[in-house]
């Protein structure tokens, strides 16, 4: 549901497939791979489409024992746990590879005389002051390699963070294979969901309102349309639709 979740999933795929040079469609058809991934995802209790919501969900529920997130988010979570005098997390890095977001920042010449502004912003982002701020927030300002000059109160070794150790980088397949892999997760690997739609059919929805509602539901429930944005349901999901106005008009 997030960049971190998707990249973690690709890492799981590569590892369970035996770390092939390139992940292919044939790997995704392997029944043993699908079984192993299904068993892995049985341990997932919740997912989130937003890193901030994921953090809040984890911090506000003591039942969760682990969370998959980016390093900076986990550092932030641990800082908050420490302040609350709660047990802190220990970070685990898959030896098969992690994804590194290099936060590319580029300029597209649109002939609007904005290059000077772009360069000012770029210089500020690369300044020692701002780079220092990023590091204090748990962001690695060096790409990949090692760094032995960090604030260990932030990159805390007691939390399993070792900036002196080189991180292996996840190998990503082609866009087509990634799309099929995500569809495989949505339609076969994740736990099934029960989604309830409560649709307002009252008089206030007459005209444009009901047309937009109907159009939205057609989009969501049409597999081909919904799959464009990875919103499709799987055959194991349960869908309930409740129509209401001043009373419940029907349940389907």
Where are these regions (language model features)?
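A conserved helix-loop-strand patch within extracytoplasmic ligand-binding domains
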Residues: 1-15
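Short amphipathic alpha-helical coupling segments at ligand-binding clamshell hinges
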Residues: 113-125
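Ligand-binding pocket segment of bilobal, Venus flytrap-like solute-binding proteins
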Residues: 20-91
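Periplasmic-binding protein-like
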Residues: 124-146
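Active-site-proximal beta-strand/loop segments in catalytic clefts of secreted hydrolases
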Residues: 1, 69-72, 94-96, 108, ...
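A bilobed periplasmic-binding-protein/Venus flytrap-type ligand-binding module shared by bacterial periplasmic
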Residues: 101-116, 133-137
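Acidic, polar low-complexity linker/tail segments
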Residues: 141-196, 203-211
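Von Willebrand factor
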Residues: 189-252
């Amino acid at each position: 549901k997030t960049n971190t979740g998707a990249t973690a999933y690709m890492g799981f795929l590569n590892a369970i497939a035996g770390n092939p040079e390139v992940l292919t469609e044939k790997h995704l058809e392997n029944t043993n791979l699908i079984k192993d991934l299904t068993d892995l995802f049985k341990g997932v209790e919740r997912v989130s489409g937003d890193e901030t919501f994921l953090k809040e969900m984890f911090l506000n529920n003591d039942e969760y024992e682990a969370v998959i997130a980016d390093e900076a988010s986990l550092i932030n979570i641990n800082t908050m746990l420490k302040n609350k005098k709660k047990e802190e997390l220990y970070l685990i890095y898959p030896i098969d590879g992690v994804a590194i977001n290099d936060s590319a920042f580029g300029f597209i010449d649109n002939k609007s005389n904005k290059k000077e502004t772009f360069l000012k912003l770029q210089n500020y982002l690369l300044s020692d002051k701002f780079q220092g701020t990023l590091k204090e927030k748990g962001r690695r300002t060096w790409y990949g390699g090692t760094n032995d000059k960090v604030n260990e109160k932030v990159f805390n070794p007691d939390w399993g963070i070792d900036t002196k150790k080189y991180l292996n980088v996840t190998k990503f397949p082609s866009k087509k294979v990634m799309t099929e892999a995500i569809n495989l997760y949505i339609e076969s690997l994740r736990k099934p969901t029960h989604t309830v739609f409560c649709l307002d059919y009252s008089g206030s929805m007459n005209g444009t309102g009901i047309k937009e509602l109907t159009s939205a539901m057609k989009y969501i429930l049409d597999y081909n349309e919904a799959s464009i944005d990875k919103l499709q349901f799987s055959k194991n999901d349960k869908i309930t639709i409740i129509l209401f106005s001043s009373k419940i008009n029907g349940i389907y």
